[in-house]
From Swiss-Prot:
GO terms for cellular component: cytoplasm. Keywords: Cytoplasm, Heme biosynthesis, Iron, Lyase, Metal-binding, Porphyrin biosynthesis. It comes from the Bacteria. This is Ferrochelatase. Belongs to the ferrochelatase family. InterPro entries: Ferrochelatase (IPR001015), Ferrochelatase_AS (IPR019772), Ferrochelatase_C (IPR033644), Ferrochelatase_N (IPR033659). The gene is hemH. It is an enzyme of class 4 (lyase). Pathway: Porphyrin-containing compound metabolism; protoheme biosynthesis; protoheme from protoporphyrin-IX: step 1/1. It is found in: Cytoplasm. Its EC number is 4.98.1.1. Its main location: cytoplasm.
């Protein structure tokens, strides 16, 4: 009987000690296996924030056509990445580090297009009797296609849990934070590895968007341009000159007009220079950074006989980024 009472007391003590606030890192996700490539594409192209066709039937039809045209190519890409996206395991490692550094909160993550979905994560947090939540967008710049889509999904999932009504706060953008930009600049310098910065063209590559989405009021392009200007100011303050500092857009899909210039276009244009690329719109490495920037465009750079072509890693699960997230959460206003 004493043993049973002791175990019950331990459970009560653990419950009392367990954090009452949870931070959910929100990202797009990526296939956790080759089987999930189809799931990933289906969920992405059924998202009205991605494929902005108001008629549900038409959106599903167009989405199915895109999926059928891309699924085999996408599987080959993920085969080259070891059969899955690196995004989920890196995000898991980041939350492990966050929980070690800040045991006063519980850090977890939810993905938009692949498990773990927001609905699954929120059900778990309801069982943990969490009292407050922070939805932390992992996209530095705001866009309806990423940030708003993730928040909409998370809030809808929360509404479906009728008995779980925690207090919710959000972090929807953080690109203007000087501490973040110092980490980015240090990552660039680390990748240069004592090479002279003035010998390189620095390209900040971000995920592209159809121009029609920006024309409809999305602030993404404006925020990306502002982010680059802030980084240029910081480089000037720290006396770190580059041959040129440019912004480009990658991952164009389909025949419609997208934001320009493209990353490919700038690599071609500066073929006589050394090039270093930083993936400015991504915080966690994924197929667009590892395959597109570091494999596909590296082959292009070799064909163009570019002497040095460097690609910076994302912030990933670095201790600097983890500390930045913790500080942003601590400083979040009520």
């Amino acid at each position: 009987m004493n043993l049973i009472n002791e175990k019950l007391n331990n459970l009560e003590n653990n419950a009392a000690k367990s954090p009452k606030e949870a931070v959910i890192l929100l990202n797009m996700g990526g296939p956790n296996s080759l089987y999930e490539v189809g799931v990933f594409l289906k969920n992405m192209f059924d998202d009205p924030f991605i494929l902005t066709i108001k008629n549900n039937f038409m959106r599903k039809m167009v989405g199915k056509m895109i999926i059928n045209s891309r699924i085999e190519k996408s599987k080959k890409i993920y085969e080259k990445l070891g059969g899955k996206s690196p995004l989920t395991p890196i995000t898991f490692a980041l939350t492990e580090r966050l929980n070690e550094l800040d045991p006063s909160r519980f850090y977890t993550y939810a993905m938009r297009y692949t498990p773990p979905y927001a609905s699954m994560v929120l059900q778990d947090l309801a069982l943990k009797e969490v009292e407050s939540l922070v939805f932390f967008s992992m996209y530095p710049q705001y866009s309806s296609t990423t940030t708003l889509s993730s928040f909409n999904d998370a809030f809808n999932a929360l509404k479906s849990l009728e008995t779980f009504r925690p207090k919710v706060r959000v972090i929807e953008r953080f690109y203007a934070d000087k501490k973040l930009n110092e980490i980015i600049l240090n990552t660039i310098l680390s990748t240069l590895n004592n090479r002279k910065s003035q010998d390189f063209v620095l390209i900040f590559s971000v995920h592209g968007l159809p121009k029609s989405i920006v024309d409809a009021g999305d602030t993404y392009q404006q925020e990306c341009e502002h982010h680059v200007s802030l980084l240029k100011e910081l480089m000037q303050q720290k006396n770190i000159p580059f041959k040129e500092v440019l912004l480009s857009y990658q991952s164009k899909l389909g025949p419609m007009k997208w934001l320009e210039p493209s990353t490919e276009e700038l690599i071609e244009k500066h073929r006589k220079s050394n090039i270093i690329i930083y993936p400015l719109a991504f915080t966690i490495d994924n197929s667009e950074t590892i395959y597109e920037l570091d494999m596909q465009y590296r082959l292009m750079a070799e064909r163009l006989a570019i002497k040095e072509y460097l690609v910076c890693p994302c912030l990933n699960d670095s201790i600097e980024f983890a500390k930045f997230i913790i500080e942003r959460v601590k400083n979040l206003k009520e």
